[in-house]
Amino acid sequence: MRPNQRLYLQDILERILHIEFCTSGGRESFLNDRLLQDGVILAFMVIGEAVKRLDSQAIEGRPEVAWSDYAGFRDVLIHRYHDILLEEVWQFSQEDLAALKTAVTELLNDLENSDAPT
């Protein structure tokens, strides 16, 4: 893997945990709290940017994750910020984060194991 891959993976994992925290109060709480909304939106922006920087070899081995969806969602959030539908952000936060979290955790573990002395 290229340098900084661990940092990108750690960024993704940290942002997933942040999204989980911000959405733990439920849909209504999220939809009524601008601070929570902004936190989740920013976290998705970071996830999408970090996904774009990951080695294609690493993510191709994890087809259960729709990696390009995260990169594309980031682009929508950045370039069409005035059209953001909070219901879509909520749905995105509830649907596939578990698979992404699992894949990122496995990739980080793979890096740890490859760095371990033999």
Predicted feature locations:
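Solvent-exposed interaction patches of small proteins and small membrane subunits
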Residues: 1-118
